[in-house]
């Protein structure tokens, strides 16, 4: 029978405990300070037009309101005001954003048109997470003279397929690994035959962060595993001293 030295057993036990700690502890990714983004329109290149970058664009920090009165670019046309606003408070770890336009028309291709009213995307975030909403008061997408009515105040991630045009998501919402919430009031993805372009109306992003000076909370699972590791180390040390 081969006898393993006591010191070897202690070191092996500590290594095993450390391995369990590293493998079982979940990975965390979080913002260190709050952030927010808002814009009213953006589009990939389509209809022989260049891509439309996000506009008007507001980001926090530093935050503030950006406004365009009237717009004719790419597939978009309106004489209404487009307004994007962001704000935040690092002391509280909060952020907010909004993107609005009262009326907007879309030209997505030959005999492909759209009309939207009352577009509003909003979000807010704090250290515990983010919430948001993206709505329209009314909307239609018309293909070869045949209109498809878009739902007003749609539940999040409402999907609509428009024959001859593509897919539309109303009140589109997603959250990334940093708990940053993204909301699109209207997101159109054209058919591949039409170029597969993305067209977005009403976009906001919000991410919260720990309040300034706050002590980060330790995840319960990490706490349990960490406590077990500490206990194992203490017991191993006692055992080793007893055998020495």
Question: Which ranges hold each PLM region?
Answer:
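Extended, solvent-exposed, non-transmembrane regions
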Residues: 3, 9, 22, 26-241
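Bacterial N-terminal signal peptides
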Residues: 13-23
């Amino acid at each position: 029978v081969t006898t393993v030295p006591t010191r070897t057993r202690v070191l092996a036990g500590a290594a095993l405990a450390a391995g369990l700690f590293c493998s079982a502890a979940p990975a965390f990714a979080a913002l260190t300070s709050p952030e927010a983004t808002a814009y009213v329109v953006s589009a990939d290149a389509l209809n022989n037009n260049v891509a439309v970058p996000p506009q008007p664009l507001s980001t926090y920090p530093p935050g503030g309101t950006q406004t365009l009165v009237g717009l004719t670019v790419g597939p978009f046309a309106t004489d209404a005001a487009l307004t994007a606003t962001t704000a935040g408070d690092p002391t509280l770890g909060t952020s907010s954003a909004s993107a609005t336009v009262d009326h907007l028309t879309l030209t997505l291709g030959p005999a492909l048109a759209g009309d939207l009213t009352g577009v509003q995307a909003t979000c807010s975030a704090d250290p515990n997470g983010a919430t948001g909403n993206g709505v329209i008061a009314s909307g239609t997408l018309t293909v070869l003279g045949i209109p498809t009515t878009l739902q007003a105040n749609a539940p999040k991630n409402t999907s609509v397929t428009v024959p001859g045009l593509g897919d539309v998501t109303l009140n589109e919402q997603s959250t990334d690994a940093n708990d940053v919430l993204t909301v699109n009031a209207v997101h159109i993805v054209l058919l591949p035959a039409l170029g597969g372009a993305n067209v977005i109306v009403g976009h906001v992003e919000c991410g919260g962060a720990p309040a300034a000076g706050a002590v980060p909370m330790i995840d319960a699972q990490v706490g349990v595993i960490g406590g077990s590791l500490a206990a194992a180390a203490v017991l191993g040390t006692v055992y080793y001293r007893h055998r020495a």
